[in-house]
């Protein structure tokens, strides 16, 4: 039995290493990850350039592409045995609310699900207690292997950046919301050309009870099921009426 692991922080990221060591006792683990940080890459595929592989001494494979490239390449060319599950993470920072639209971590899991496999994305709401995220990753992956989910969904998991003993449990949540990000930093490079830096995500706009933000803020692991089908089904009838006016 094989598990495929990827991430968006890159093949040398501590979170990826923590995830590998947490899961290696459950199955044969194949690690295929970007050769550098691709945070915020979303579902981008590399179409204009070839992908190059680097086989590392620890058995990991580094790819000169995005998280989605890594999973796409792994499932179509690298993996001899079809994995039972795609696991993405452990991300260095939370992926909650609108973050999931930009997240390379979530995108890697989405690509696995798009190609027909169960998938889970795991993020730590900080950069310290990877052991806590690794513990919950092992528990949840073990449960998915024993009792696979049959619906077309990806599990988006966020873990509080706390010592394991301080985490209160797990909550099933919905996505919260952020205000739009407005901060763009304008600067000048050494040659006098203007450059721009995209700022941090917008502030939290909706973090009520039942949201991923609320769970993390109160010391709980958040699990949010995500759908690949983005169709706003509830709006189909209204849109038809609007068109017929």
From Swiss-Prot:
Pfam family for this entry, one: SurE
Domain of life: Bacteria
Any one GO molecular function term: nucleotide binding
Free-text comment on the cofactor: Binds 1 divalent metal cation per subunit.
A cellular-component GO term for this protein: cytoplasm
Top EC class of this enzyme: hydrolase
Cofactor(s) annotated in UniProt: a divalent metal cation
SUPFAM superfamilies on file: SurE-like
Residues annotated to bind a divalent metal cation: 8-9, 39, 91
Family assignment from sequence similarity: Belongs to the SurE nucleotidase family.
Protein name: 5'-nucleotidase SurE
Species this chain originates from: Psychromonas ingrahamii (strain DSM 17664 / CCUG 51855 / 37)
